[in-house]
């Protein structure tokens, strides 16, 4: 296979004589599931909201001197079509379906793209391989195979995360998150080989390692944010109830959202990080999947709960660093263990659901594809019940979460491609895409 890199050219045409105006989780037990269309109320308490950005108004451009009407003029480039506005209510799901893309994968747990215009989808197989989907076909040979160094002694271990460097087209770098043969977390950098559909298996450079006290709550997500830094989700270290109180302990990196600069190996700490180390946010139990809205930079974190509540957390793009999402003082928006300090500013989730409805939340992607009715809708699911929710802010800024689809899938992740289309993964081997009927 050959892949051509898309190069975009832009030009600015000036037409004299005209005014230019700038415009601005283990196997589940049976659960009770709500029917599609049932509303799940947002959690109460303090929740960050996105601030509206004012549209700047520019002064009219200088008209210049009159030109000869007979003189040839340059053709005017038509303006780019405006992006659809975000919806403020959830769409009727009856006109849409989850259409199969490929099957035959071995425990797929994540999907992403290289952002290079190729259209290729890269699927993470938990045992330790990365597979390519090209033009709707699963490529037989894996892009990367590190099964010999990936440990999967527990059901939550394995190859868990994949992120391509923003300059992948130039440097060929990508990053993975896996548990090693000892069960510890490894974040490592690899490089593509001369063959674009094959990684260099021997190019591993270890960026970060974390000792894991138990076999679960490993987090796993890695993603480049709009700031160009690598974001890493870490679980609280496992067992039940965070027995080591890692999530609230700023001296350890477990139960956190980390943010590092990987352009200087092994890595450096961005100046804006609030505590002078890798930590950007804390108080998380197992942020298995998180997602930056590619259009706005807003952050959604699906944090897997303990025995009662699954939650979705949110930060606006301009949020102050150092957010505390409350675990293990709270599970969701509800008291769990101990009393937080009087000056603690705990951020409650914008959506939650209880365990009669499911058992393990799977985030999540903000739809930015071709269907206007879905613009700005955050889609998330539950691994155990197969339910799929939509989440939006209404015209008054209130969060609305509602079950939109009931499936028989085991969904470890909801992901999207570089065009903003959204996909479901079924741990039993299938990838599906949201489409019109």
Q: What is the predicted function of each stretch?
A:
Residues 2-13:
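Bacterial N-terminal signal peptides that target proteins for export
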Residues 13-21:
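Bacterial N-terminal signal peptides
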Residues 20, 24-93:
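Ser/Thr-rich, Proline-interspersed low-complexity disordered segments
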Residues 28, 65-241, 289-292, 297-305, ...:
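Acidic, Gly/Ser/Thr-rich repeat motifs that build Ca2+-stabilized beta-propeller blades
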Residues 91-97, 137-141, 194-205, 265-276, ...:
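Beta-strand initiation motifs
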Residues 141-154, 203-218, 264-280, 327-356:
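Surface-exposed loop and turn segments in beta-propeller and other repeat-based domains
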Residues 187-195, 246, 250-262:
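Beta-propeller blade signature
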Residues 399-418:
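Conserved blade-ending motifs and adjacent loop-strand segments that build the rim/top face
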């Amino acid at each position: 296979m050959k892949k051509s890199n898309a190069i975009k050219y832009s030009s600015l045409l000036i037409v004299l004589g005209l005014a230019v105006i700038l415009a601005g989780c283990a196997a589940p037990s049976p659960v009770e599931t709500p029917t599609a269309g049932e509303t799940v109320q947002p959690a109460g308490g303090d929740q960050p909201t996105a601030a509206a950005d004012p549209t700047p108004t520019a002064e009219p451009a200088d008209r210049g001197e009159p030109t000869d009407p007979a003189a040839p003029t340059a053709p005017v480039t038509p303006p780019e079509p405006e992006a659809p506005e975000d919806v403020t209510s959830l769409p009727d799901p009856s006109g849409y379906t989850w259409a199969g893309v490929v099957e035959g994968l071995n425990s797929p747990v994540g999907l992403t793209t290289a952002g290079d215009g190729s259209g290729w989808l890269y699927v993470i197989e938990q045992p330790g391989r990365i597979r390519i989907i090209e033009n709707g076909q699963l490529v037989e040979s894996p892009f990367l195979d590190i099964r010999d160094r990936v440990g999967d002694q527990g059901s939550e271990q394995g190859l868990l995360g994949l992120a391509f460097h923003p300059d992948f087209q130039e440097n060929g770098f990508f990053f993975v998150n896996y548990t090693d043969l000892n069960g510890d977390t490894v974040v490592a950098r690899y490089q593509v080989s001369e063959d674009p559909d094959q990684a260099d298996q021997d190019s591993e450079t270890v960026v970060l390692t974390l000792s894991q006290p138990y076999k679960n709550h490993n987090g796993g997500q890695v993603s480049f944010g709009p700031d160009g830094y690598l974001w890493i989700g870490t679980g609280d270290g496992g067992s039940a109830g965070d027995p080591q109180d890692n999530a609230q302990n700023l001296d350890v990196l477990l139960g956190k959202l980390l943010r590092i600069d990987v352009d200087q190996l092994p890595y450096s700490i961005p100046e804006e990080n609030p505590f002078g180390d890798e930590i950007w946010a804390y108080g998380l139990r197992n942020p298995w999947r998180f997602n930056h809205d590619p259009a706005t930079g807003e952050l959604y974190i699906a944090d897997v709960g303990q025995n009662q509540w699954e939650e979705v957390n949110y930060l606006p793009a301009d949020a102050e660093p150092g957010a505390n999402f409350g675990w293990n003082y709270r599970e969701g928006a509800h008291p769990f263990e101990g009393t937080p300090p009087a000056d603690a500013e705990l951020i409650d989730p914008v959506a939650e659901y209880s365990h009669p409805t499911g058992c393990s939340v799977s985030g999540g992607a903000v739809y930015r594809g071709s269907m206007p009715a879905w613009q700005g809708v955050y889609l998330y699911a539950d691994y155990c019940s197969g339910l799929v929710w939509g989440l939006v802010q209404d015209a008054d800024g209130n969060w609305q979460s509602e079950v939109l689809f009931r499936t028989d899938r085991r969904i470890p992740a909801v992901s999207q491609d570089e065009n903003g289309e959204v996909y479901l993964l079924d741990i039993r081997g299938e990838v599906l895409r949201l489409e019109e009927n």
